[in-house]
Each structure stands twice: as structure tokens, then as C-alpha cells.
Amino acid sequence: MQPLYIKNDDERKVVTEKLARVVYAETLGSSLLAAEALCSMIANLHLKTARLLPDIATDKSIFESLAEDSARHASLDADAGRRDFQMCLRTVRRMMNGLLNDSVMGATKFHRAENLPQWAVNAGYIAEIGGMLFYL
């Protein structure tokens, strides 16, 4: 018997799911504050650059977890029933409905504290939340 693949035609739900998976993979569901901070950064990037959320959700230059060689890449396939994934999903929904306060003061870039990308070498971060540094 062939598996049945159900196509979700509701693009908003698809984008919500993709963003939730990215937020989960980047934060590993560590805390609500971390999920809110990353969602705030995504919203800021969308609003300040007019980039579409589906494009942001798949941008490997923003999210290290999207790279196949990333240690966090496997987390993109987390079980949707996990409580920490569900927290990320709810946070993304709040962001997409405009119900999330900007906890990163307008930041549009981030990296995790254990990494230092070249673009951040001479930049000053404006917020540190959940092991992530946020920049304008």
C-alpha cells in the first residue's frame, strides 16, 4: 500500500508549520522567551525588509539549522506532538496574528552565542535572550 500524502493548500498553515520547525530547531524548544525572541526577530525582518515569510522560513543564511550539515538540522523533523514544539507553534501563530510584542527591540539579525559569524565581528548586539544575540 502506498502512503497517502495530504497536500495542505492553506499556505498560511504551511508557512506557520515551517516557521515553527525553524524556531524549534534554532532554540531546541529551550524556553518561551527564546521562541518569542526569535519570532520577534522574524517579524521585524519581515516588516523592515518586506521579505515574505515563506522566503524567510527557508533562508539558510539566516537559520543555520536549515543547512543539511548542521547539528540542529535533524530537529526540523521533530515530532509535532512534542510539548516544546507545540510551544514554538503557538508562538509563531501569535507572531503571525500580530499578538507578539517585540522582545528584541527591532533586531533583524541573530546568531547563537556559541558562534560568531563574520558579519557580527564588529557589530554590537542589542539583546541577549535564550543563548542568542540579536542585532539591528
What are these regions (language model features)?
Residues 2-136:
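Bacterial extracytoplasmic/cell-wall-associated proteins, especially those involved in peptidoglycan
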